[in-house]
């Protein structure tokens, strides 16, 4: 077993999956069957979020990419002209950081890339430049895609550091700025002090989902050491200021007394003026943070927290003085290190005061009325839960969470809140914050939503107000309306993620779009900045449509903005553009046709981590730049991947490189398993034993194909079991079609395993018609070919067909072979046999004779009545049944039977007697005894029979 946990071979006595994989990949490449260009067919355009090349492609990529790959192959079978291609993301700082770490021979990085990413040491030590890393991992990613048999149009491949791609991004940013969507100013951003850059989700080692949280700093005042001071309290709930009885400091930590100056940026300049803002007392960590957020801090002295105890500070709203008390629960890494005490509503505050014996001294001030609570909610819930003291963290968290939730949704401010009385808690924050800021009794401070936010370089990130920073103004309400309109018009798989996108749009704020370091496109109107990696990856799907023309040899100089303006928007004079770009008019017109043919994008596929950034940005940028008819049509979201329960990690493992999976199991096994092991948007846990099981079952289909070709075809009439297998197979055509259309690929796997079981049952029931088996294999080879194309190509060839199954049409349903009664009949036999086994087991007998009794006619009449009635609720259907005389006379027995029928499921009545008679020989052989259907009613057993549940007597 290697560092990634792989311990499985690909060999099998009857088939070599790797040899088959090699064979068909070579044939596909030579035939160029996946190259797509516009024609008269309906198009289908699908893409996935391209991978970032700071490592090999891993199991997480495999799931995200195999889903659209499977759908692309299916859509080709539906006679769609499918465009499915890939690019590589290399811009930003992670690759730069990795190159530096390799150059510095960081032990953990060297170990990870040698052992987890499988880079030989002699090759690894050469990856000390961004260019070397991009070259290495782009080759490995290309190889991985090809080894998995992805049906890509490789003519359209590109990297985001290509000079020609940069010209496309320059056009995008010129357009956004022209529309007023790009602005320059000061804004708080996630920032790496070491890299000297704003950082985005992809730049982070920890805290990828962290957001910037806005705290209100409430300016309490006092006198300390002979000076008037401000002691700011950070809070997310400014309304609680009306209920403050005390404040908390950590007696064991260090604070500072410092002069604070506000930095006010000069108009049209990055220079600042300083405005005195008083002497503040805050925690040391807070002082460091404030320095980065538009303030200059000059420290006068350091103070131990214990020195502040006994100090009284004035509430700026109520004007009441409150004491400072000690509290170890005050975290210095959040806020100012000084916390307001609101014991009537905060369980932590109440229990801390109770532990100190200070409740009577300071009292409780209620400020929020909540339905279902008394005057002092914190006291009530602490006593109800039995919280012992401040160390009872679990119960305190539970209490806090419940109160805050109830206050937010059901609470309103009481008379202690003056002019704000009667306003609901959920509506007050914005108004209060605005009023406090205008009155100069509060300021704003920014914190991360998570404490551990670490750049890939290893440095702890901060929130920094960057001056002269370029932003995309995603906060624009009119722009958000268009984004919402787009989301409403789109398809989502699964559907329930639609609301999450609406929520992300509502929460969207302005975003830094450029940085000083890293790989990428220079900001065309300010070349001191480089466009960051989540801003150059929002509309590249449009670039795919014309990339094959560009990759034929067009130069960056030829890709003038007017070219993109015409190709994507239809603006401009094509003759002038041809003259200015030195690109033929015919080529430009072909580029325009190709874009118009393939756009809009039908489906965008990604893992769920890209919902709050890339995917939402994609929607914003499309609605800004493109006509409505070219807005994206659909987004598919899959969950994460774990390996034997362990979370994937590029630095610690496991990684499970895609190429390693292909070589150990074969591409088809990996494709089948990763697409069918979990439904959207659930996470998938890769289990190698289950992969081996999938491999074995796929090989059974191959072996069946070989056997049906080796045996002579029979010409006998179809038996009932033949008809049953054909019914099941042709029913699968529609089921698989629905599964593919709705991205429910796990159902394909379940249907395949059902096929394996059906084939076992068919053989067990005496099925041996080779013509039937060949027809079943042909259909299922087509149904599975989007998932397991190599194996299906091989089977197709074994069946005697020429050409590629990859170019075959989806199988058509033969409606004359669909007969639900056959399926119900076989399920009836299986159920009856299971009941027989259970009775044998309980009675511990081996019968010589067995009686099977079917239900009385009136019971079938009741089944039909229930089947035809739309009402499926027991209580509702009983009155309807009892109106019928033929049922009413059976009294209580009817009530019992209705419940029994509901348990087994309301189905149509079938010819049970005929079915049992036809299966009698089979049942006799299974149980080695004589079977009698509806013979003498021995010991009155027949009355116990109900539809689909024959009564059984053995002797």
UniProtKB/Swiss-Prot annotation:
Keywords: Aminoacyl-tRNA synthetase, ATP-binding, Cytoplasm, Ligase, Nucleotide-binding, Protein biosynthesis. It comes from the Archaea. It is an enzyme of class 6 (ligase). A motif ('KMSKS' region) lies at residues 647-651. One of its GO terms (biological process) is leucyl-tRNA aminoacylation. One of its GO terms (molecular function) is leucine-tRNA ligase activity. A motif ('HIGH' region) lies at residues 51-61. It is found in: Cytoplasm. Gene3D superfamilies: Class I aminoacyl-tRNA synthetases (RS) (3.30.2320.20), HUPs (3.40.50.620), Isoleucyl-tRNA Synthetase, Domain 1 (1.10.730.10), leucyl-tRNA synthetase (1.10.10.720), Valyl/Leucyl/Isoleucyl-tRNA synthetase, editing domain (3.90.740.10). It catalyses: tRNA(Leu) + L-leucine + ATP = L-leucyl-tRNA(Leu) + AMP + diphosphate. Belongs to the class-I aminoacyl-tRNA synthetase family. PANTHER family: LEUCINE--TRNA LIGASE, CYTOPLASMIC (PTHR45794:SF1), LEUCYL-TRNA SYNTHETASE (PTHR45794). This is Leucine--tRNA ligase. It comes from Methanococcus maripaludis (strain C7 / ATCC BAA-1331).
């Amino acid at each position: 077993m290697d560092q990634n946990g792989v311990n499985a071979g690909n060999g099998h006595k009857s088939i070599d999956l790797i040899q088959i994989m090699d064979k068909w990949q070579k044939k596909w490449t030579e035939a160029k069957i996946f190259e797509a260009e516009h024609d008269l067919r309906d198009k289908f355009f699908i893409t996935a979020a391209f991978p970032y090349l700071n490592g090999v492609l891993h199991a997480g990529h495999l799931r995200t990419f195999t889903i659209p790959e499977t759908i692309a192959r299916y859509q080709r079978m539906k006679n769609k002209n499918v465009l499915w291609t890939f690019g590589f993301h290399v811009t930003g700082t992670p690759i730069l950081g990795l190159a530096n770490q390799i150059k510095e021979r960081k032990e953990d990085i060297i170990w990870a890339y040698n052992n987890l990413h499988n880079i030989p040491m002699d090759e690894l030590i050469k990856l000390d430049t961004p260019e070397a890393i991009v070259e290495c991992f782009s080759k490995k990613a290309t190889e991985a895609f090809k080894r998995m048999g992805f049906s890509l149009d490789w003519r359209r491949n590109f990297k985001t550091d290509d000079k020609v791609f940069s010209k496309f991004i320059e056009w995008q940013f010129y357009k956004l700025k022209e529309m007023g969507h790009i602005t320059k100013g000061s804004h708080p951003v996630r920032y790496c002090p070491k890299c000297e850059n704003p950082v985005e989700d992809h730049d982070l080692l920890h805290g990828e989902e962290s957001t910037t949280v806005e705290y209100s700093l409430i300016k309490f005042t006092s006198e300390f050491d002979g000076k008037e001071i401000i002691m700011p309290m950070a809070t997310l709930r400014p309304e609680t200021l009306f209920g403050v009885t005390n404040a908390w400091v950590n007696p064991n930590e260090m604070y500072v007394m410092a002069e604070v100056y506000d930095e006010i940026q000069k108009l049209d300049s990055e220079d600042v003026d300083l405005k005195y803002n008083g002497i503040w007392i805050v925690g040391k960590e807070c002082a460091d943070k404030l320095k980065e957020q538009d303030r200059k801090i000059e420290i006068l002295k350091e103070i131990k927290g214990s020195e502040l105890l006994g100090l009284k500070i004035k509430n700026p709203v109520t004007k009441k003085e409150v004491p400072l008390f000690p509290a170890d629960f005050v975290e210095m890494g959040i806020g100012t290190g000084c916390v307001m005490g609101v014991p009537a509503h905060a369980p932590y505050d109440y229990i801390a005061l109770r532990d100190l014996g200070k409740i009577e001294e300071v009292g409780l001030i209620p400020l929020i009325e909540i339905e279902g609570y008394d005057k002092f909610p914190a006291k009530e819930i602490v006593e109800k839960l039995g919280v012992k003291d401040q160390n009872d963290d679990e119960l305190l968290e539970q209490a806090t969470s419940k109160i805050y939730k109830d206050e937010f949704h059901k609470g309103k401010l009481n008379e202690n809140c003056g002019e704000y009385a009667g306003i609901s808690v959920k509506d007050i924050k914005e108004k209060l914050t605005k009023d406090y800021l205008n009155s100069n009794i509060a300021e704003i401070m920014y914190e991360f939503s998570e404490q551990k936010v670490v750049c890939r370089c290893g440095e702890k990130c901060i929130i920094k107000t960057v001056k002269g920073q370029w932003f995309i103004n995603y906060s624009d309400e009119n722009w958000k309306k268009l984004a919402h309109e787009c989301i409403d018009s789109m398809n989502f798989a699964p559907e329930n993620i639609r609301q999450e996108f609406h929520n992300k749009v509502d929460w969207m704020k302005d975003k830094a779009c450029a940085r000083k370091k890293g790989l990428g496109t220079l900001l065309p109107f300010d070349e001191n900045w480089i466009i960051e990696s989540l801003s150059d990856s929002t509309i590249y799907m449009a670039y795919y449509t014309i990339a094959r023309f560009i990759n034929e040899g067009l130069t960056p100089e030829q890709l003038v903005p007017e070219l993109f303006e015409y190709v994507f928007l239809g603006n401009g004079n094509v003759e002038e553009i041809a003259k200015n770009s030195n690109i033929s008019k015919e080529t430009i017109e072909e580029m325009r046709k190709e874009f118009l043919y393939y756009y809009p994008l039908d489906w965008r596929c990604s893992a769920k981590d890209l919902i709050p950034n890339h995917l939402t940005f994609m929607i914003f940028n499309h609605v800004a730049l493109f006509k409505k008819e070219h807005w994206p049509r659909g987004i598919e979201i899959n969950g994460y991947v774990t390996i034997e329960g362990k979370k994937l990690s590029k630095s610690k493992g496991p990684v499970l490189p895609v190429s390693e999976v292909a070589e150990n199991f074969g591409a088809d096994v990996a494709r089948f398993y990763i697409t069918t092991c979990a439904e959207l948007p659930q996470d998938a846990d890769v289990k190698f034993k289950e992969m081996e099981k999938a491999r074995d079952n796929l090989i059974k289909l191959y072996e069946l194909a070989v056997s049906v070709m080796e045996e002579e075809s029979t010409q006998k009439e179809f038996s009932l079991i033949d008809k049953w297998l054909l019914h099941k197979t042709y029913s699968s055509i529609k089921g698989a079609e629905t599964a593919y259309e709705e991205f429910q690929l796990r159902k394909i796997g379940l249907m395949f395993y059902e096929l394996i079981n059906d084939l076992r049952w068919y053989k067990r029931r005496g099925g041996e018609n080779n013509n039937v088996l060949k027809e079943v294999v042909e259909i299922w080879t087509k149904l599975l070919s989007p998932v397991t194309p190599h194996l299906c190509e091989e089977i197709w060839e074994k069946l005697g067909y020429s050409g590629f199954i990859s170019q075959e049409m989806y199988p058509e349903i033969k409606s004359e072979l669909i007969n639900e009664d056959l399926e119900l009949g076989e399920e009836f036999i299986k159920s009856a046999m299971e009941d027989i086994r259970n009775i044998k087991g309980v009675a511990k007998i081996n019968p010589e004779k067995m009686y099977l009794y079917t239900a009385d006619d009136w019971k079938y009449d009741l089944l039909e009545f229930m089947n035809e009635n739309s009402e499926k609720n027991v209580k509702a259907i009983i009155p309807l049944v009892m109106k019928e005389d033929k049922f009413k006379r059976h009294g209580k027995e009817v009530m019992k039977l209705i419940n029994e029928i509901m348990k087994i499921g309301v189905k149509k009545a079938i010819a049970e007697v005929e079915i049992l008679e036809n299966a009698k020989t089979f049942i006799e052989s299974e149980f080695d005894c004589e079977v009698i259907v509806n013979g003498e009613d021995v010991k009155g057993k027949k009355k116990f029979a109900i539809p689909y549940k024959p009564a059984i007597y053995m002797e």
